Amino acid sequence: MKIQEVKRILTRWQPSSFTLYREVFTQYGGSINMHPDIVDYFMKRHNWHFKFFHYKEDDKIKGAYFICNDQNIGILTRRTFPLSSDEILIPMAPDLRCFLPDRTNRLSALHQPQIRNAIWKLTRKKQNCLVKEAFSSKFEKTRRNEYQRFLKKGGSVKSVADCSSDELTHIFIELFRSRFGNTSSCYPADNLANFFSQLHHLLFGHILYIEGIPCAFDIVLKSESQMNVYFDVSNGAIKNECRPLSPGSILMWLNINRARHYCQERQKKLLFSIGILKPEWEYKRMWSTPYFTGKSIC
């Protein structure tokens, strides 16, 4: 018996199945890189290998997770597919207190009361940004004024749900090139198109246009459960010539507001991640609170 198998036995995590994992996720939710539809996509379309585990307490399954390709908890492929790897939120019951037998240094701060063998501040540097529960009236007024100015300059808004997968792929690649030029590589076009096509139902948010031409698009993915809805901005791109109109700020505000309304209508908790905090991304502090990600010690 391997050491890792012994660790799982000692910490009460049992071998499980994809079917059971989906059920647990549907109940408790998790980050988009743990979503069963994403898992299913990589199992069927890319022949990736997954091992599933669940935690049972008082004859009730309280949590589940998987190991991808015998390496990681979560699907970590941010350079080739539009999936964030900034944090991992494992589907767990709110009252679960357990030891996690596998290593990761990307645990969501929301797991701090749940996972006993993790550190959250000592030697930790990486912080993930979760959108604030509310903004000040001054902040909201500034965003509304930006939006009205944008509309008066010929701006318009379209839902990603109304765009085809090919259209979304073309828009994102063009805007990405405009934003980064040759300084950063975009996702392979075939990967992006196939991902959008197969997982279109997980896409959320808007695209901004100026005089009918796309000027801003954030890839926002939605992970919904019975308890909460987790939104994740995996990447974004804007048209450089439109920067004076603040399209990035307007788009963020519109997407967050739409996410809030979506959750309010369904009476579910909102979780909205805008990724890691870096010195060049200090603007994220306007929108969010940074939290250290946790590292499991095992």
Q: Where do the protein language model's features map onto the residues?
A:
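A conserved beta-strand-loop-helix scaffold within acyl/acetyltransferase catalytic domains
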Residues: K2-D59, F66-N72, R116-W120, E133-R243
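Short, solvent-exposed cationic patches
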Residues: L76-L100, N235-P247
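Short, composition-biased local secondary-structure segments
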Residues: Q27-Y28, Q112-L122, S249-L254
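Well-ordered, non-membrane alpha-helical segments in soluble/globular domains
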Residues: S84-D86, M92-A93, R103-T104, F139-R143, ...
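Aromatic (often tryptophan-rich) hydrophobic motifs at membrane interfaces
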Residues: L202-C298
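Short catalytic/ligand-binding loop motif for oxyanion handling, primarily in non-cytosolic enzymes
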Residues: K62-G63, N72-L76, W281-Y283
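Non-catalytic accessory segments adjacent to catalytic cores
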Residues: L83-K125
